[in-house]
Swiss-Prot record:
Gene behind this protein: yvfU
Organism lineage: Bacteria, Bacillati, Bacillota, Bacilli, Bacillales
Organism: Bacillus subtilis (strain 168)
Pfam families: GerE, Response_reg
Magnesium keyword on record: no
Reported function: Member of the two-component regulatory system YvfT/YvfU.
Entry-linked PANTHER family: TRANSCRIPTIONAL REGULATORY PROTEIN DESR, TWO-COMPONENT RESPONSE REGULATOR
Name of the molecule in the record: Uncharacterized transcriptional regulatory protein YvfU
């Protein structure tokens, strides 16, 4: 019997998912949570075979929970189930050791099949996301990524020069190049584009 844990902040969807998966002969739902913090503590205590998690949840996101579980050496396999087909989220989920990343508009049978595959050690990802990852190659150099990451944190040009030991002119040139490469209006928009695509 595959032991499942579901974390989803929409109560109705949480209940529906639990009921539908409980109908599968080889699955049982052993726990549920409406936020990421509850999910983290319960998963560490219950050690389910598979955790199905939304990304956008109160207190902690599903991605944050997945990262914490990996740090703590938890053996439960994580499947991210979300409405967000963003390569940035997908890449972060893969780095956090997620065994699956599926979109909520899929069929319950597809989710059940994905759960069975994950238990066998396979990884299951939404085709839309794998296509996006192949299509969108990061155009930024390592240094440009570093500078844009700092800019995304709200650092000024002066802050960046002090942190990276570069002149203000050099940093301005890098930022100008980044904005041009990403076809953005300013550094804020450039950071937003890069974050969404998983480039920084």
């Amino acid at each position: 019997m595959i032991r499942l844990f579901i974390a989803e902040d929409q109560r109705m969807l949480l209940g529906a998912l639990g009921s539908l998966l409980d109908l599968e002969e080889d699955m049982t739902v052993i726990g549920q949570a409406l936020n990421g913090e509850e999910a983290l503590h319960a998963i560490l205590k219950l050690e389910p075979d598979v955790c199905i998690m939304d990304i956008e949840m109160p207190v902690r996101s599903g991605l944050n929970v997945a990262e914490e579980l990996m740090k703590k050496g938890c053996v439960s396999k994580v499947i991210i189930l979300t409405t967000f087909a963003r390569p940035g989220y997908f890449e972060r989920a893969v780095k956090a050791g997620a065994h699956g990343y599926l979109l909520k508009d899929g069929e319950i049978d597809d989710l059940a099949d994905a759960i069975r595959k994950c238990v066998k050690g396979k990884r299951v990802f939404s085709p839309e996301l794998t296509f996006n990852m192949m299509r969108d190659e990061n155009p930024l150099t390592v240094r440009e990524q570093e500078i844009l990451r700092l800019a995304a944190l709200g650092k000024t040009t002066k802050d960046i020069t002090l942190e990276l030991y570069l002149s203000q002119g050099t940093v301005r040139n890098y930022i100008s190049e980044i904005i041009q490469k990403l076809n953005a209006k300013n550094r804020t928009e450039a950071a937003s584009i890069a974050e969404e695509k998983g480039w920084i």
